[in-house]
Amino acid sequence: MLRFIQKFSQASSKILKYSFPVGLRTSRTDILSLKMSLQQNFSPCPRPWLSSSFPAYMSKTQCYHTSPCSFKKQQKQALLARPSSTITYLTDSPKPALCVTLAGLIPFVAPPLVMLMTKTYIPILAFTQMAYGASFLSFLGGIRWGFALPEGSPAKPDYLNLASSAAPLFFSWFAFLISERLSEAIVTVIMGMGVAFHLELFLLPHYPNWFKALRIVVTLLATFSFIITLVVKSSFPEKGHKRPGQV
């Protein structure tokens, strides 16, 4: 650095020596002399003393990337890589969980499908569907307990997690109590599934994303199947055996 300053001061002193009054009467020889002086002291090519004095700095600066930062592009790529909704994580579900979930939807979908095909309302099938839905609510409450109990789980075994897991159980119990009025019992099961869905996805968001996607699919299909059963009951004639305990 000192050598660079010394060289620059020498060049400045040489320029001062060649300070000519450039004007209209300046001779061509004087202008050429000034031009040669500037070329000798400020050559566009790199000087050997400069490259020998700073070999490390030259090599380091040549490896640097000098293009401007593009934070907007990086943010846009991150936003594009992120899925738009929770349902997109359904493909990330483990195969056993996906197969068991699809098999578990059969008791929800089969009764209204049979009644639609026969165009009759069969009480025993409707009761079977309602009983399965109420049992499924108890299963959802047990999932929360099982998720909160292991050590190191993101869901701690506190009052919020454990007490909220009992909410679906109460809807299930009440649905069996009023099973004599099957339509009201089905509506109770639908309400319980909605409450469980709200607790798991919004108030207690500790489950994996693929499990949330499965819960969305199960809740929508189960609710839709229950609604079809209620429509069939009000639209088609009743036929078949009465449910157990019904006169």
From Swiss-Prot:
TM helices/strands, residue ranges: 97-117, 122-142, 159-179, 185-205, 216-236
GO CC annotation: membrane; mitochondrion
Keyword Chloroplast: no
Keywords: Membrane, Transmembrane, Transmembrane helix
Compartmental location: Membrane
Pfam family, one: DUF3429
Membrane topology summary: Multi-pass membrane protein
PANTHER family in UniProt: TRANSMEMBRANE PROTEIN 69
Descriptive protein name: Transmembrane protein 69
